[in-house]
Amino acid sequence: MKFSYSFVQVVSLLLSLSPSVEGFTRSRNDACKPNHPFRPLPPSQPRTKTCHVVSNGHGKDDSKNIMQALHKCNNGGKVVFDANKVYTVGTALDMTFLKHIDLEVLGKIQFTNDTDYWQAHSFKHGFQNATTFFQLGGQDVNVYGGGTFDGNGQVWYDLYAEDALILRPILFGIIGLKGGTIGPLKLRYSPQWYQLVANSSDVIFDGIDISGYSSSKNEAKNTDGWDTYRSDNIVIQNSVINNGDDCVSFKPNSTNIIVQNLHCNGSHGISVGSLGQYKGEVDIVQNVLVYNISMYNASDGARIKVWPGVSSAMSEDLQGGGGLGSVKNITYNQMYIENVDWAIEVTQCYGQKNLTLCNEHPSNLTISDIHFKNFRGTTSGKRDPDVGTIVCSSPNVCSDIHAENINVKSPKGTDEFVCTNVDKSLLDVNCA
Protein backbone atom coordinates (compact mmCIF):
# COMPACT_ATOMS: atom_id res chain seq x y z
CA MET A 1 0.00 0.00 0.00
CA LYS A 2 2.87 2.32 -0.79
CA PHE A 3 1.17 5.27 -2.44
CA SER A 4 3.91 7.85 -1.93
CA TYR A 5 5.13 8.34 -5.53
CA SER A 6 1.77 9.06 -7.13
CA PHE A 7 0.69 10.93 -4.01
CA VAL A 8 3.65 13.32 -4.25
CA GLN A 9 2.90 13.88 -7.94
CA VAL A 10 -0.69 14.84 -7.17
CA VAL A 11 0.29 17.10 -4.27
CA SER A 12 2.97 18.79 -6.38
CA LEU A 13 0.32 19.58 -8.98
CA LEU A 14 -1.97 21.00 -6.33
CA LEU A 15 0.81 23.15 -4.92
CA SER A 16 1.54 24.56 -8.37
CA LEU A 17 -2.00 25.83 -8.81
CA SER A 18 -3.06 29.29 -7.75
CA PRO A 19 -6.44 30.95 -8.25
CA SER A 20 -6.60 33.43 -11.12
CA VAL A 21 -10.11 34.68 -10.54
CA GLU A 22 -10.89 37.99 -8.90
CA GLY A 23 -11.69 36.35 -5.58
CA PHE A 24 -11.62 32.99 -3.88
CA THR A 25 -14.79 31.36 -5.19
CA ARG A 26 -14.21 27.65 -4.60
CA SER A 27 -16.53 26.07 -2.05
CA ARG A 28 -14.66 25.24 1.13
CA ASN A 29 -16.76 22.14 1.66
CA ASP A 30 -16.26 20.87 -1.90
CA ALA A 31 -12.50 21.26 -1.47
CA CYS A 32 -12.42 18.83 1.47
CA LYS A 33 -11.75 15.36 0.03
CA PRO A 34 -12.14 12.51 0.60
CA ASN A 35 -13.30 13.20 4.17
CA HIS A 36 -15.53 16.16 4.89
CA PRO A 37 -15.34 18.36 7.99
CA PHE A 38 -17.28 17.46 11.09
CA ARG A 39 -19.44 20.52 10.49
CA PRO A 40 -20.08 22.31 7.15
CA LEU A 41 -17.72 25.23 6.55
CA PRO A 42 -19.32 28.66 6.01
CA PRO A 43 -19.29 30.10 2.46
CA SER A 44 -17.01 32.92 1.35
CA GLN A 45 -18.67 36.10 0.09
CA PRO A 46 -17.74 37.59 -3.32
CA ARG A 47 -14.88 40.10 -3.50
CA THR A 48 -15.52 43.27 -5.48
CA LYS A 49 -12.34 45.36 -5.25
CA THR A 50 -8.58 44.82 -5.52
CA CYS A 51 -5.63 46.48 -3.78
CA HIS A 52 -1.98 45.88 -4.70
CA VAL A 53 0.61 46.18 -1.94
CA VAL A 54 3.50 48.49 -2.84
CA SER A 55 6.96 47.05 -2.22
CA ASN A 56 9.58 49.58 -1.10
CA GLY A 57 12.35 47.23 -2.19
CA HIS A 58 15.97 47.14 -0.99
CA GLY A 59 14.99 45.44 2.30
CA LYS A 60 12.94 48.41 3.52
CA ASP A 61 10.04 47.65 5.85
CA ASP A 62 6.77 47.25 3.92
CA SER A 63 4.59 46.81 7.02
CA LYS A 64 2.80 50.17 6.66
CA ASN A 65 2.01 49.47 3.00
CA ILE A 66 0.59 46.08 3.93
CA MET A 67 -1.65 47.47 6.66
CA GLN A 68 -2.88 50.30 4.41
CA ALA A 69 -3.89 47.83 1.71
CA LEU A 70 -5.65 45.59 4.23
CA HIS A 71 -7.70 48.45 5.64
CA LYS A 72 -8.53 49.77 2.17
CA CYS A 73 -9.76 46.43 0.83
CA ASN A 74 -11.28 45.03 4.01
CA ASN A 75 -14.96 44.07 3.86
CA GLY A 76 -15.20 42.67 0.37
CA GLY A 77 -11.84 43.06 -1.35
CA LYS A 78 -8.66 41.29 -2.38
CA VAL A 79 -5.13 42.35 -1.43
CA VAL A 80 -2.43 41.26 -3.88
CA PHE A 81 1.27 40.75 -3.13
CA ASP A 82 2.61 40.89 -6.67
CA ALA A 83 4.70 38.18 -8.30
CA ASN A 84 8.47 38.63 -8.52
CA LYS A 85 8.49 41.10 -5.64
CA VAL A 86 9.88 40.73 -2.13
CA TYR A 87 7.94 42.32 0.72
CA THR A 88 9.97 42.90 3.88
CA VAL A 89 8.22 42.80 7.26
CA GLY A 90 10.09 44.26 10.22
CA THR A 91 7.08 45.16 12.36
CA ALA A 92 4.70 42.86 14.25
CA LEU A 93 1.39 42.96 12.36
CA ASP A 94 -1.97 42.68 14.14
CA MET A 95 -4.38 41.58 11.40
CA THR A 96 -7.21 40.29 13.58
CA PHE A 97 -9.65 42.90 12.26
CA LEU A 98 -10.04 41.28 8.83
CA LYS A 99 -13.48 40.50 7.42
CA HIS A 100 -14.54 39.15 4.02
CA ILE A 101 -11.13 39.64 2.44
CA ASP A 102 -8.63 37.67 0.33
CA LEU A 103 -4.85 37.90 0.47
CA GLU A 104 -3.37 36.69 -2.81
CA VAL A 105 0.33 36.12 -2.22
CA LEU A 106 2.16 35.74 -5.53
CA GLY A 107 5.56 37.08 -4.44
CA LYS A 108 7.61 36.59 -1.27
CA ILE A 109 6.95 37.96 2.22
CA GLN A 110 10.16 37.88 4.24
CA PHE A 111 10.59 38.73 7.92
CA THR A 112 13.66 40.59 9.12
CA ASN A 113 16.37 38.93 11.19
CA ASP A 114 16.31 41.55 13.96
CA THR A 115 16.11 39.04 16.81
CA ASP A 116 16.08 41.71 19.54
CA TYR A 117 13.06 43.44 18.02
CA TRP A 118 11.07 40.26 17.49
CA GLN A 119 11.71 38.92 20.99
CA ALA A 120 10.38 42.18 22.41
CA HIS A 121 7.48 42.82 20.04
CA SER A 122 6.23 39.53 18.60
CA PHE A 123 2.76 38.51 19.78
CA LYS A 124 2.84 36.42 22.97
CA HIS A 125 0.28 33.61 23.26
CA GLY A 126 1.16 32.09 26.64
CA PHE A 127 1.05 28.41 25.80
CA GLN A 128 4.54 26.87 25.60
CA ASN A 129 6.06 30.35 25.17
CA ALA A 130 4.51 30.62 21.71
CA THR A 131 5.06 33.92 19.89
CA THR A 132 4.19 34.94 16.33
CA PHE A 133 5.48 37.44 13.76
CA PHE A 134 1.87 38.37 13.04
CA GLN A 135 -1.62 37.37 14.03
CA LEU A 136 -4.21 36.99 11.29
CA GLY A 137 -7.84 36.64 12.29
CA GLY A 138 -11.37 37.86 11.86
CA GLN A 139 -14.11 36.41 9.66
CA ASP A 140 -14.08 34.90 6.17
CA VAL A 141 -10.40 35.38 5.29
CA ASN A 142 -8.62 33.51 2.50
CA VAL A 143 -4.85 33.49 1.95
CA TYR A 144 -3.61 31.84 -1.24
CA GLY A 145 -1.62 32.38 -4.42
CA GLY A 146 1.29 29.95 -4.11
CA GLY A 147 3.72 32.62 -2.92
CA THR A 148 6.22 32.36 -0.09
CA PHE A 149 6.43 33.31 3.58
CA ASP A 150 10.10 33.29 4.66
CA GLY A 151 10.93 33.39 8.38
CA ASN A 152 14.68 34.02 7.95
CA GLY A 153 15.20 31.19 10.40
CA GLN A 154 18.95 30.60 10.25
CA VAL A 155 19.82 33.40 12.66
CA TRP A 156 17.29 31.92 15.09
CA TYR A 157 18.63 28.37 14.80
CA ASP A 158 22.08 29.63 15.70
CA LEU A 159 20.82 31.86 18.52
CA TYR A 160 18.74 29.07 20.06
CA ALA A 161 21.86 26.89 20.21
CA GLU A 162 23.39 29.55 22.48
CA ASP A 163 20.30 30.26 24.60
CA ALA A 164 17.41 27.80 24.82
CA LEU A 165 15.18 30.38 26.54
CA ILE A 166 14.94 32.86 23.67
CA LEU A 167 11.47 33.50 22.25
CA ARG A 168 11.47 32.33 18.63
CA PRO A 169 8.54 33.59 16.53
CA ILE A 170 6.16 31.24 14.74
CA LEU A 171 6.03 32.00 11.03
CA PHE A 172 2.27 31.95 10.42
CA GLY A 173 -0.17 32.85 13.20
CA ILE A 174 -3.89 32.17 12.66
CA ILE A 175 -5.42 33.71 15.77
CA GLY A 176 -9.17 34.04 16.22
CA LEU A 177 -10.15 33.29 12.62
CA LYS A 178 -13.75 32.24 12.02
CA GLY A 179 -14.07 30.83 8.51
CA GLY A 180 -11.14 30.80 6.10
CA THR A 181 -9.04 29.02 3.51
CA ILE A 182 -5.25 29.00 3.73
CA GLY A 183 -3.28 27.78 0.70
CA PRO A 184 -1.73 27.10 -1.65
CA LEU A 185 1.34 28.70 -0.06
CA LYS A 186 5.02 27.98 0.50
CA LEU A 187 6.36 28.35 4.05
CA ARG A 188 10.12 28.51 4.49
CA TYR A 189 12.65 28.71 7.35
CA SER A 190 10.42 29.30 10.33
CA PRO A 191 12.31 30.14 13.55
CA GLN A 192 10.05 27.75 15.47
CA TRP A 193 6.64 26.19 14.65
CA TYR A 194 5.49 26.93 11.13
CA GLN A 195 1.83 27.52 11.95
CA LEU A 196 -0.15 28.17 15.12
CA VAL A 197 -3.93 27.87 14.78
CA ALA A 198 -5.39 29.27 18.00
CA ASN A 199 -8.93 30.20 19.05
CA SER A 200 -10.09 29.58 15.49
CA SER A 201 -12.83 27.57 13.78
CA ASP A 202 -14.05 26.51 10.34
CA VAL A 203 -10.69 26.86 8.58
CA ILE A 204 -9.21 24.69 5.82
CA PHE A 205 -5.49 24.48 5.04
CA ASP A 206 -5.05 23.13 1.51
CA GLY A 207 -1.83 22.87 -0.49
CA ILE A 208 0.80 24.00 2.02
CA ASP A 209 4.44 23.37 1.09
CA ILE A 210 6.70 23.48 4.18
CA SER A 211 10.48 23.25 4.10
CA GLY A 212 13.51 24.80 5.76
CA TYR A 213 16.64 23.26 7.20
CA SER A 214 19.65 24.77 8.92
CA SER A 215 22.77 25.52 6.89
CA SER A 216 24.98 25.38 10.00
CA LYS A 217 25.75 22.75 12.63
CA ASN A 218 22.81 24.07 14.68
CA GLU A 219 19.61 22.21 13.85
CA ALA A 220 16.29 23.86 13.10
CA LYS A 221 14.41 22.65 16.18
CA ASN A 222 10.73 22.65 17.21
CA THR A 223 9.65 23.31 13.63
CA ASP A 224 6.17 21.77 13.86
CA GLY A 225 4.12 22.01 10.68
CA TRP A 226 0.83 22.86 12.41
CA ASP A 227 -0.14 23.30 16.05
CA THR A 228 -3.86 23.58 16.71
CA TYR A 229 -4.82 25.10 20.06
CA ARG A 230 -8.28 25.89 21.40
CA SER A 231 -9.61 25.46 17.88
CA ASP A 232 -12.54 23.59 16.34
CA ASN A 233 -13.56 22.23 12.95
CA ILE A 234 -10.21 22.51 11.19
CA VAL A 235 -9.18 20.67 8.00
CA ILE A 236 -5.51 20.19 7.01
CA GLN A 237 -4.94 18.45 3.67
CA ASN A 238 -2.99 17.97 0.43
CA SER A 239 0.33 19.23 1.77
CA VAL A 240 4.04 18.39 1.79
CA ILE A 241 6.00 18.91 5.01
CA ASN A 242 9.79 18.67 5.37
CA ASN A 243 10.62 19.67 8.93
CA GLY A 244 12.23 18.61 12.19
CA ASP A 245 9.40 18.16 14.68
CA ASP A 246 5.70 17.20 14.69
CA CYS A 247 4.18 17.17 11.23
CA VAL A 248 0.89 18.13 12.89
CA SER A 249 0.28 18.53 16.62
CA PHE A 250 -3.12 18.73 18.30
CA LYS A 251 -2.51 20.90 21.34
CA PRO A 252 -5.03 21.41 24.20
CA ASN A 253 -8.69 21.81 23.33
CA SER A 254 -8.44 20.85 19.67
CA THR A 255 -11.74 19.34 18.54
CA ASN A 256 -13.29 18.10 15.30
CA ILE A 257 -10.11 18.02 13.23
CA ILE A 258 -9.54 16.35 9.83
CA VAL A 259 -5.97 15.75 8.60
CA GLN A 260 -5.67 13.99 5.25
CA ASN A 261 -3.37 13.44 2.28
CA LEU A 262 -0.06 14.59 3.78
CA HIS A 263 3.53 13.71 2.91
CA CYS A 264 5.65 14.17 6.05
CA ASN A 265 9.44 13.87 6.07
CA GLY A 266 11.88 14.21 8.97
CA SER A 267 9.21 14.82 11.57
CA HIS A 268 8.11 13.52 14.96
CA GLY A 269 4.88 12.21 13.51
CA ILE A 270 1.28 13.34 13.71
CA SER A 271 0.77 13.87 17.41
CA VAL A 272 -1.97 14.32 19.94
CA GLY A 273 -0.33 16.57 22.49
CA SER A 274 1.60 17.08 24.39
CA LEU A 275 -1.23 17.36 26.92
CA GLY A 276 -1.36 17.76 30.69
CA GLN A 277 1.62 20.08 30.86
CA TYR A 278 0.04 22.71 33.10
CA LYS A 279 -1.01 21.56 36.56
CA GLY A 280 -4.72 21.92 37.24
CA GLU A 281 -5.65 22.93 33.69
CA VAL A 282 -8.06 20.81 31.64
CA ASP A 283 -6.87 19.71 28.20
CA ILE A 284 -9.30 18.05 25.80
CA VAL A 285 -8.60 16.64 22.36
CA GLN A 286 -11.47 14.78 20.75
CA ASN A 287 -12.97 13.87 17.39
CA VAL A 288 -9.83 13.73 15.25
CA LEU A 289 -9.42 11.82 11.98
CA VAL A 290 -5.95 11.38 10.44
CA TYR A 291 -6.20 9.74 7.02
CA ASN A 292 -3.90 8.78 4.14
CA ILE A 293 -0.49 9.82 5.42
CA SER A 294 3.01 9.07 4.09
CA MET A 295 5.60 9.32 6.86
CA TYR A 296 9.34 9.22 6.10
CA ASN A 297 12.50 9.47 8.22
CA ALA A 298 10.62 10.26 11.41
CA SER A 299 10.75 9.43 15.10
CA ASP A 300 7.07 8.49 15.09
CA GLY A 301 4.16 7.79 12.78
CA ALA A 302 1.05 8.12 14.97
CA ARG A 303 1.68 9.52 18.42
CA ILE A 304 -0.22 10.36 21.59
CA LYS A 305 1.92 12.09 24.22
CA VAL A 306 0.65 12.99 27.68
CA TRP A 307 2.53 14.37 30.67
CA PRO A 308 2.49 12.32 33.91
CA GLY A 309 0.90 13.41 37.17
CA VAL A 310 4.25 14.57 38.54
CA SER A 311 6.44 17.51 37.60
CA SER A 312 8.79 16.58 34.75
CA ALA A 313 11.25 18.21 32.37
CA MET A 314 11.59 17.39 28.69
CA SER A 315 14.21 20.12 28.20
CA GLU A 316 15.35 23.42 29.67
CA ASP A 317 12.53 25.29 27.92
CA LEU A 318 9.84 22.56 28.14
CA GLN A 319 8.66 21.41 31.56
CA GLY A 320 5.37 20.44 33.13
CA GLY A 321 3.04 17.70 34.35
CA GLY A 322 -0.04 17.32 36.52
CA GLY A 323 -2.69 18.58 34.11
CA LEU A 324 -6.20 17.17 33.70
CA GLY A 325 -8.40 16.26 30.74
CA SER A 326 -9.12 13.60 28.14
CA VAL A 327 -8.21 12.25 24.72
CA LYS A 328 -11.23 10.70 23.01
CA ASN A 329 -12.37 9.49 19.59
CA ILE A 330 -9.07 9.67 17.72
CA THR A 331 -8.60 7.66 14.51
CA TYR A 332 -5.44 7.12 12.47
CA ASN A 333 -6.38 5.32 9.25
CA GLN A 334 -4.07 4.45 6.34
CA MET A 335 -0.49 5.40 7.08
CA TYR A 336 2.56 4.33 5.10
CA ILE A 337 5.85 4.58 7.00
CA GLU A 338 9.47 4.29 5.94
CA ASN A 339 12.50 4.66 8.22
CA VAL A 340 10.33 5.62 11.21
CA ASP A 341 11.44 4.70 14.76
CA TRP A 342 7.97 3.99 16.20
CA ALA A 343 5.04 3.25 13.89
CA ILE A 344 2.73 3.94 16.82
CA GLU A 345 3.61 5.53 20.15
CA VAL A 346 1.25 6.11 23.05
CA THR A 347 2.87 7.43 26.22
CA GLN A 348 1.63 8.98 29.45
CA CYS A 349 5.17 9.57 30.70
CA TYR A 350 6.09 12.38 28.33
CA GLY A 351 9.00 14.37 29.73
CA GLN A 352 9.67 11.92 32.57
CA LYS A 353 12.62 9.56 32.14
CA ASN A 354 12.10 7.95 35.56
CA LEU A 355 9.40 5.41 34.69
CA THR A 356 9.08 4.25 38.30
CA LEU A 357 8.26 7.79 39.37
CA CYS A 358 5.86 8.13 36.45
CA ASN A 359 3.99 4.98 37.42
CA GLU A 360 3.80 6.14 41.03
CA HIS A 361 2.17 9.36 39.80
CA PRO A 362 0.08 8.29 36.79
CA SER A 363 -1.34 10.78 34.37
CA ASN A 364 -4.53 12.63 35.26
CA LEU A 365 -5.68 12.54 31.63
CA THR A 366 -7.82 9.69 30.32
CA ILE A 367 -7.27 8.15 26.89
CA SER A 368 -10.21 6.33 25.29
CA ASP A 369 -11.84 5.39 21.99
CA ILE A 370 -8.58 5.33 20.01
CA HIS A 371 -8.25 3.53 16.66
CA PHE A 372 -5.08 2.74 14.69
CA LYS A 373 -5.96 1.10 11.36
CA ASN A 374 -4.28 0.05 8.14
CA PHE A 375 -0.60 0.84 8.76
CA ARG A 376 2.04 -0.38 6.30
CA GLY A 377 5.79 -0.05 5.98
CA THR A 378 9.14 -0.48 7.65
CA THR A 379 10.63 1.09 10.76
CA SER A 380 14.15 2.46 11.09
CA GLY A 381 15.27 -0.42 13.29
CA LYS A 382 16.24 1.96 16.09
CA ARG A 383 13.84 0.25 18.50
CA ASP A 384 14.47 -3.34 17.38
CA PRO A 385 12.84 -5.74 17.90
CA ASP A 386 9.96 -3.37 18.68
CA VAL A 387 8.08 -1.37 16.05
CA GLY A 388 5.51 0.27 18.32
CA THR A 389 4.74 1.11 21.93
CA ILE A 390 1.34 1.53 23.57
CA VAL A 391 2.00 2.24 27.22
CA CYS A 392 -0.32 3.77 29.79
CA SER A 393 0.83 4.80 33.25
CA SER A 394 -2.20 3.07 34.81
CA PRO A 395 -4.99 0.81 33.50
CA ASN A 396 -7.47 3.16 35.16
CA VAL A 397 -6.80 5.99 32.71
CA CYS A 398 -6.72 4.09 29.39
CA SER A 399 -9.58 2.20 27.74
CA ASP A 400 -10.91 1.18 24.36
CA ILE A 401 -7.62 1.47 22.46
CA HIS A 402 -7.77 -0.53 19.22
CA ALA A 403 -5.18 -1.53 16.61
CA GLU A 404 -6.07 -3.48 13.47
CA ASN A 405 -4.40 -4.40 10.21
CA ILE A 406 -1.00 -3.15 11.35
CA ASN A 407 1.49 -4.54 8.83
CA VAL A 408 4.72 -2.88 9.95
CA LYS A 409 8.07 -4.59 10.38
CA SER A 410 11.58 -3.64 11.32
CA PRO A 411 14.41 -4.03 8.78
CA LYS A 412 15.16 -7.37 10.47
CA GLY A 413 11.56 -8.55 10.03
CA THR A 414 10.40 -8.25 13.63
CA ASP A 415 7.01 -6.76 14.50
CA GLU A 416 6.84 -6.64 18.30
CA PHE A 417 4.94 -4.02 20.30
CA VAL A 418 5.39 -2.88 23.88
CA CYS A 419 1.90 -3.08 25.44
CA THR A 420 1.45 -1.97 29.06
CA ASN A 421 -1.70 -1.24 31.10
CA VAL A 422 -3.94 -1.67 28.04
CA ASP A 423 -6.47 -4.28 26.95
CA LYS A 424 -4.36 -6.48 24.67
CA SER A 425 -7.45 -8.25 23.31
CA LEU A 426 -8.27 -5.06 21.38
CA LEU A 427 -4.81 -4.84 19.83
CA ASP A 428 -4.24 -6.86 16.66
CA VAL A 429 -0.47 -6.57 17.07
CA ASN A 430 2.29 -8.77 18.46
CA CYS A 431 2.49 -7.59 22.08
CA ALA A 432 5.83 -8.86 23.39
From Swiss-Prot:
Keyword Heme: no
Pfam families with a match to the protein in the record: Glyco_hydro_28 (PF00295)
Molecular-function GO term, any one: polygalacturonase activity
Reactions this protein catalyses: [(1->4)-alpha-D-galacturonosyl](n) + H2O = alpha-D-galacturonate + [(1->4)-alpha-D-galacturonosyl](n-1)
Chief location of this protein within or outside the cell: secreted
EC number(s) from the headed UniProt entry: 3.2.1.67
Residue spans of the PbH1 repeats: 231-252, 254-274, 285-306, 327-348, 362-394
Disulphides: 247-264, 392-398
Database matches in InterPro entries: Glyco_hydro_28 (IPR000743), PbH1 (IPR006626), Pectin_lyas_fold (IPR012334), Pectin_lyase_fold/virulence (IPR011050)
Gene Ontology cellular component list: extracellular region
Residue positions the entry lists as glycosylated: 113, 129, 199, 253, 265, 292, 297, 329, 354, 364
GO biological process entries: cell wall organization; pectin catabolic process
Signal sequence interval, chain numbering: 1-23
Active site per UniProt: 245 (proton donor), 268
Localization (cell): Secreted
Keywords annotated in UniProt: Cell wall biogenesis/degradation, Disulfide bond, Glycoprotein, Glycosidase, Hydrolase, Repeat, Secreted, Signal
Family assignment from sequence similarity: Belongs to the glycosyl hydrolase 28 family.
Its biological purpose: Specific in hydrolyzing the terminal glycosidic bond of polygalacturonic acid and oligogalacturonates.
Name of the featured protein: Probable exopolygalacturonase X
